[in-house]
């Protein structure tokens, strides 16, 4: 046990590897804050990072408790240790004991079990990952985790006053809209009721419409002529935003607006609740949270901030801002998913159309669709593994028309057809796919295999570009703070004078990532500068 920071720092400096579980996001920042202890990035091995790379969606998660259970090494959960501690704070006369007397032995035990489980987990992962995961993929995930841990500590400034004002406006709109819905859907009245025993007349039962009840929404819309096609496993009608958008009944539009207002209010309330004493929201990120290798977000989910094309999206994005004298730089990869497709197709003409031509018109002709907009919807639905019925709905048809579209499109893009077949064969043979940087991509189903491959490649590209950009910003000593890393987008706060430099460096990092990863389709990016997220994306 170390009781002096100098002794601990010297010990850590002498180590080749420092193995922790969640050290990047917790232990190392705590040591830095309390004792000013620093750890070299090259020394860090984080079993949480490795475990999430190994299997992002493993049942029961990646806590040391869960891994201890899997590996047969039970560790006392923190809540149990805390419970013991609270009981041992008091002596027989209920007088408080000195803090360190009862607590330190318990914490020693807790720490020892943590260390044991972490060591066993490291050995387990080292063995399991030696063949199907490259050193490059492990190194990349550690580098990204270090950057994102810093991003979490940075936080993103939210204009609390403007957020509260928008919240009040939306609540007023929701109240007015709720009143209007009572006119659209009048109360149901059960009249002419009599008591079963006495035969006496009973008062009418008046049931007002409850727009918060999905069951009532379904019943009322069916009465208006809606014929639902989607139901849950238990037979309940599915009512959600997507379903309501497809119902060509005025009353459905009114319900959709109610649910949208309700959702926006809940979102803004969660952002305001998340503001910390520094005026910023410190959203949490799992850097390899999805099976594709993409990051996932929570507390709050920064990937679900409404975009500028959504209803009240501009107003919501306008709430996220920077400190006085600074700028926000939004950087996006250009056409990332289609460039990943071009890389794997290895078709010179298709690559040319993606990079320099009009790929959506090319796809429109290949599929035989009427409009370019239909082609844009079609290609992404196709790549996401949509079924023939969904594909058919794009052109106003059904499953039969959808299958004809798919067949025609594949017939006219033979290299895509061959890629699709190859990916399906690999999945059928292995049950997983090799990722762009030599990682193992676990695939949920055959129909999602191509999409997993493409999204996985895009995730690796953006992570590699992130590492390159961070390195260059540090090399040039440009002050910056990452605010958001979502899919193919970065939001970065910097001094106003450096904004264009940061944007250009971001574009170059994306290009360079493509070169380093030996992409057969050149990559590019674009950026915008402003004061709020509305300005930059």
How should each PLM-predicted stretch be described?
Residues 19, 44-45, 211, 328-332:
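Short hydrophobic beta-strand that contains or immediately precedes a catalytic carboxylate
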Residues 24-37, 52-55, 218-225, 334-349:
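Short active-site loop/helix that positions an aromatic residue
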Residues 204, 282-283, 287-290, 365-486, ...:
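Conserved catalytic core of nucleic-acid polymerases
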Residues 287-370:
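Function-dense linear segments that define catalytic or interfacial modules
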Residues 502-510:
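Short amphipathic alpha-helices in soluble, non-transmembrane regions
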